[in-house]
Amino acid sequence: MHPKIANLCLEKKCHFASTSYISPEIKKFDKDAKSMGLIFINEVGLDPGIDHFFSHLLVKDLDKQNLENISVSYQSYCGGVPATPNDFKYKFSWSPVGVIKALNSSSKFIKDFKESIVVPYKHISNYDINNEIFEAYPNRNSLPYIEEYMFPKNWKIEEFVRGTLRLKGWKNAWEEIFNTLEKKPENLDEKIKNKSDELWNLYQYKEDEEDRVILWVKL
């Protein structure tokens, strides 16, 4: 959808802004947009977006201290959850298909100075934020952001992960979905689509219903 909208913006000579990650398709519009004096900007939401801003501030602040031979641990976690927890520990503001498929797509990060690749739903752990326990898992490929956030080359990176937060109990509430992903049936896409329709009917946000967002960036 975003490439179609971006192309329409070029045709109409309009600026383009999106909260979504920069995709290869969107990158192709960069040259034309600049030549036309248009602003095409992505990743300007909470995550991705505000988390980038906090990350750059933390890196700059630590770098100014001119410390030598340091090991650093970077964590950035964000999540949107119901303001009033429900039995499913989650509600949907967009297609459940995308949420489920993201859980089944490999995530890449650094742990104990080593690169790790995991499937998110198999790597859920408790995460404490100001004495509130959430459940967390790594999201997408974190590694390009080491350069994006301009980590100095002399820093030894013990941990670098960007991930997602969920309410405590979310893992158990989603056990049926995880079991389906684990079994890898031939008609997995069909099962995901059917489950998505069911979840959308049961757990979509109502109009004007409040949610809660949590963002935690640590270095």
Name each region found by the language model:
Residues 1, 21-22, 77-81:
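An acidic- and aromatic-residue-enriched active-site/binding cleft used to recognize and process polar
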Residues 3, 49, 53, 139-143:
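A structural signal for well-ordered alpha-helical segments within the folded catalytic domains
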Residues 3-12, 19-42:
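Rossmann-fold NAD(P)-binding glycine/threonine-rich loop
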Residues 14-15, 73:
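Beta-sheet entry/capping signal
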Residues 61-219:
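C-terminal catalytic/substrate-binding lobe primarily of soluble NAD(P)-dependent oxidoreductases
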